Regions:
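ATP-dependent carboxylate-amine ligase catalytic core
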Residues: 2-110, 118-142, 150, 154-157
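C-terminal and late-domain segments of enzyme folds
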Residues: 107, 237, 249-259, 266-268, ...
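Cysteine-nucleophile active-site neighborhood
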Residues: 267, 292-370
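Phosphate-binding active sites in nucleotide-utilizing proteins
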Residues: 239-314
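Internal gly/pro-rich beta-alpha loop/helix module
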Residues: 124-233
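Beta-strand->loop->alpha-helix junctions that form or flank phosphate-binding loops
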Residues: 37-38, 171-179, 266-274
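Acyltransferase
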Residues: 193-237, 245-249, 415-446
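Structural motif
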Residues: 5, 84-86, 115-117, 147, ...
Length: 446
């Protein structure tokens, strides 16, 4: 099975463009690839799934233990002919100024070969010096080959023999310069696939422009498929849980949804933008993150759904709301033009544009008291990434970053979790507790 991680010395090297080209080319070759994203980013896996039709999952060594990451990788790689992981930031860049949760640590944990993407513009033999440093910085580096990005055929033919002689690494190919195929971004990263004009045409052009020695790549990256972990026998659904899913609420980890299903949840999806009512016979409500600020007017104009959510939560429906979902439960939300729109009105506080990233990055969140999802003193790794803030962020959890910065956040009761932190539910007790709360609610309602 072809298995490798695409990495780069730094952000902005074109990893996303390269992985789109590689995955499209693998599809054309009938390899049935799957994709993984190193780290907590929601948008790249969404892009892989919706744009390329490729199954894609997150692997994060801060949010998950090494054993959980190995299990998830084996589970989701099963049945595929190729597994391709995408780096985040630079190859060795992890939490703070360490390699923790870096792409290198992921490659080391999974014993994955690494294909290093290098942009040769503005340098020649200096590239070899940089590559030698990357090879020697940690042992083993797991780097097995080089792919030149944004590179002409002539430059590739010039640089390849020099780079191979200086580094001992094979240069397996190159991706030509295609300025018209750039993948646009917004304040939280890539635009979603549905927003990019002529996307399929661009992906085809990228695959056409990829020159790769496939036989050499296979020789460098072919590994035995990971042993598929045993899964519990599927049981009859224990409770129906409604999950918000549309353009405004699109940041839900696939692994979290599968963990809920594994715990006995029947997931039913609905749109806070379009549906007038919550799904019937539900015992729980999950409001993930996304872009509610881009759709504040439409969300507000759906008065029936806002009222239904308010009534359901106030009547004790077990509810989990992260980041954008948390903003939706507030009193009001500013859109990108600063206009204020009423929201569900379940929680105090209103959402506004802070004009910058707020409390960005990894942290550890500790519960102050028992609640639906947490037990007093229980700590969970979290991630935050948002430009909007709330006038009332809650005080039911203490949060601490590695550099010792601390703050309070979140609302937690017997039937509610709501806060800015994104939670990674796989490998935790959260799915089981949420399903149990949903069961209890259904048993005792009315």
């Amino acid at each position: 099975m072809i298995q490798f991680l695409i990495a780069a010395p730094r952000s902005g090297s074109g990893k996303t463009t390269v992985i789109c080209a590689v995955l499209t080319a693998l599809q054309r070759r009938g390899a049935a690839p799957c994709a993984f994203k190193c780290g907590p980013d929601y948008i790249d896996p969404m892009f892989h799934r919706s744009a390329l039709g490729v199954e894609s999952h997150n692997l994060d060594l801060y949010l998950s233990s090494p054993d959980t990451v190995r299990t998830l990788y084996a589970r989701y790689a099963a049945g595929h002919g190729a597994a391709v992981c995408e780096d985040a930031m630079g190859f060795y860049d992890g939490q703070g100024l360490t390699t923790r949760a870096s792409a290198w640590e992921l490659a080391d944990t999974l014993a994955l070969p690494v294909l290093l993407v290098v942009q040769p513009k503005g340098a020649s033999i200096t590239l070899a010096a940089e590559l030698r440093g990357l090879l020697q910085f940690r042992t083993p580096s797991h780097i097995v080959g080089i792919l030149l990005n944004d590179c002409s055929e002539a430059l590739y033919k010039t640089l390849r023999p020099m780079l191979e002689a200086e580094t001992g690494l094979p240069v397996v190919g190159y991706l030509s310069h295609l300025p018209g195929c750039a993948i646009e971004s917004r304040h939280l990263g890539l635009k979603t696939a549905g927003e990019i004009v002529d996307l399929q045409q661009k992906l085809g052009q990228l695959a056409d422009a990829l020159v790769l020695d496939w036989a050499q790549l296979a020789a460098l990256t072919d590994r035995p498929a990971p042993a598929t972990p045993p899964l519990a026998a599927p049981c009859a659904p224990l409770a129906r849980i409604a999950v918000a899913r549309d353009e405004a609420f699109c940041f839900a980890y696939a692994e979290t949804l599968d963990a809920l299903r594994d715990a006995g949840a029947e997931l039913v999806f609905f749109s806070p933008l379009r549906d007038a009512a919550l799904p019937e016979n539900i015992g729980g409500l999950y409001l993930p993150g996304g872009y509610p600020e881009l759709y504040a007017r439409q969300l507000s104009e759906n008065c029936a759904l806002r009222a239904a959510v308010q009534e359901a939560v106030q009547n004790g429906l077990p509810t989990a709301a992260e980041c954008g979902g948390f903003l939706y439960l507030g009193q009001a939300l500013d859109d990108t033009d600063g206009k204020v729109y009423p929201m569900a009105g379940v929680l105090p506080g209103s959402g506004h544009n802070a004009g910058r990233l707020v409390r960005f990055g990894y942290a550890a969140m500790t519960a102050k008291a028992d609640s639906m999802l947490f037990r007093a003193g229980e700590a969970l790794p979290i991630h935050e990434f948002h430009h909007w803030d709330s006038s009332e962020n809650g005080t039911d959890f203490s949060v601490r970053k590695a550099e010792k910065r601390q703050w309070e956040c979140g609302f937690a009761t017997a039937n509610l979790y709501a806060g800015f932190p994104h939670l990674y539910w796989a490998g935790t007790a959260l799915p089981r507790r949420f399903v149990q709360a949903a069961q209890h609610f259904l048993k005792h309602k009315g």
